Amino acid sequence: MGDFMHRYLEVIPPETTIVEAAERMREKSLGSLLVESTDAEGRMSRRSGIVTETDLIRKVLAKGMDPSLTMVDQIMTSPLMTITPDRPMLDASHLMETNHVRYLCVSDKDEIVGIISMRDLARHFVDSEGGPIRDLNDVYRPLSVLMRTTMETIASERTVLEAAQTMAEKRIGSLLVIEAGEMVGIATETDVVRKVIAARLPASSTSVGAVMNYPLIQIDINRTVRDASRLMAEERIRHLAVTDENKVVGLLSVRDLVKMVSVRDKPRFLRST
């Protein structure tokens, strides 16, 4: 774990507004921020909190709260969910999947020393020699095993507020965008945070089409899992549309990659806990 975690911690004070947090996320290209709480010696402690893009969407925007008047300490998750640096990456995947989170803080003797994301796990599982996802290389159409065929959509003329409410209700991080009956793009939590909240745009009157990612980044169903992981990394995205003969047949996310490993390895994890 210690070899893959990010040791640089982006920390904000608890009185930071949601708009300011979104601006920091956009500036640093981050999906989460730690909320400051230190021990007597000035070290980040487990009693600190974390605020994520998902929190901004589900706990603020979808509920109609004003991002400029809401503070991060009102919505942060605290205490932090942690893992020690000597634990294997597979254990991190189980903790994330079981608790439905994308980030884990790494703690050493109650001091927060790093953070690890679901994207870090996926990259490790795919690229490491003999890694668990490599086992799928010999499977026919491996992306079809991982992708989700039930795809939530939204019309491009609908508002960002409606998109946020749908994401919150369905507990998902993206919506495929429909225009004239065609899938033309994707709107994600990241888009909403960086292009709407951080830009101080009104979610109730900003259209999804104005903030969606276009064109839709696609990958053929016959490509490998490693191809998908690398394309996500190159494009700095968490979702890919999977196509079969140029028709979108599924959606693949970073979480789907990690979930497969977590489910397969669950018996070992339960025996060791």
Give a label for each model feature.
Residues 25-28, 33-54, 96, 104-119, ...:
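A glycine-centered beta-loop-beta connector
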Residues 1-48, 144, 265, 271:
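Hydrophobic, helix-prone linear segments
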Residues 1-7, 47-81, 90-93, 97, ...:
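Tandem CBS (Bateman) regulatory domains
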Residues 22-24, 37-43, 57-63, 128-134, ...:
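Short, functional N-terminal and low-complexity linear motifs
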